[in-house]
Amino acid sequence: MSGALQWWETIGAASAQYNLDPRLVAGVVQTESSGNPRTTSGVGAMGLMQLMPATAKSLGVTNAYDPTQNIYGGAALLRENLDRYGDVNTALLAYHGGTNQANWGAKTKSYPGKVMKNINLLFGNSGPVVTPAAGIAPVSGAQEMTAVNISDYTAPDLTGLTMGAGSPDFTGGASGSWGEENIPWYRVDKHVANAAGSAYDAVTDAVSAPVEAAGNYALRGVVIIAAVAIVVVGLYFLFQDEINSAAMKMIPAGKAAGAAAKALA
């Protein structure tokens, strides 16, 4: 077995624990990482189900590159989204783009279709037949997944998600799309941190050799300060919409804290 199916036993166990159809979890694994547990996205999402560091921590995942921890963490997040929204399609949108629907860009909106294509490849007529392990039952009702012919796929149980013919795309998911659309405000800090690190390294690498050759430590300090200033200013202009959005969301909390402090004074 290759791709997501090499982790089928763990997928089945995690699906049983969180009352998920294992085909749904396998589809997410295939879409996010093609079954490679060392996959890392450009914005820091990690492992088989591409968990962001903050998300992994909140789910109790201490090593996102550990296949078992990652799959259980991703399954827990899918269960949380299914409980929140009540249908698979919206749960997948939130898995990819976060819970703020205003930030669901074009690639997030295409994400459920990619997952379903991979499910059909893995379990439909064009893919290998895999029988779930004993005791692993698909969820029922609106959350049930059904393997069907991809060429005329319409799934009422996925809020009418319709897909046309085409080859499955294994390059999508968080590792291939985050950073190319609006980033949920609560992920801005990680996104900016990654960009800041790359920009700082590029600036300092460009000037470090001649400065070190000159042996001028004072000049080296000035260069580092200038590099930091350039990075900060550049990042603000690059991410000003996201930063301003995050700041605006913090204003009400700040006002409330100020009012509380004033009342206690």
Swiss-Prot record:
Quaternary structure and partners: Heteromultimer composed of proteins P7 and P14.
UniProt keywords, alphabetically: Antimicrobial, Bacteriolytic enzyme, Capsid inner membrane protein, Degradation of host cell envelope components during virus entry, Degradation of host peptidoglycans during virus entry, Lyase, Membrane, Transmembrane, Transmembrane helix, Viral genome ejection through host cell envelope, Viral penetration into host cytoplasm, Virion, Virus entry into host cell
InterPro entries registered for this protein in UniProt: Lysozyme-like_dom_sf, Transglyc_AS, Transglycosylase_SLT_dom_1
CDD domains with a match to the protein in the record: LT-like
Keyword Electron transport: no
Catalysed reactions, semicolon-separated: Exolytic cleavage of the (1->4)-beta-glycosidic linkage between N-acetylmuramic acid (MurNAc) and N-acetylglucosamine (GlcNAc) residues in peptidoglycan, from either the reducing or the non-reducing ends of the peptidoglycan chains, with concomitant formation of a 1,6-anhydrobond in the MurNAc residue
UniProt keyword Iron-sulfur present: no
Name of the protein in question: Transglycosylase
Species, as recorded: Enterobacteria phage PRD1
GO biological process: defense response to bacterium; killing of cells of another organism; peptidoglycan metabolic process; symbiont entry into host cell via disruption of host cell envelope; symbiont entry into host cell via disruption of host cell wall peptidoglycan
Transmembrane segments: 219-239
Region annotation Slt-type domain: where it falls in the sequence: 19-98
Single Gene Ontology MF annotation: peptidoglycan lytic transglycosylase activity
Highest taxon, organism lineage: Viruses
A single Gene Ontology CC term: membrane
Enzyme Commission identifier(s): 4.2.2.n1
Enzymatic class: lyase
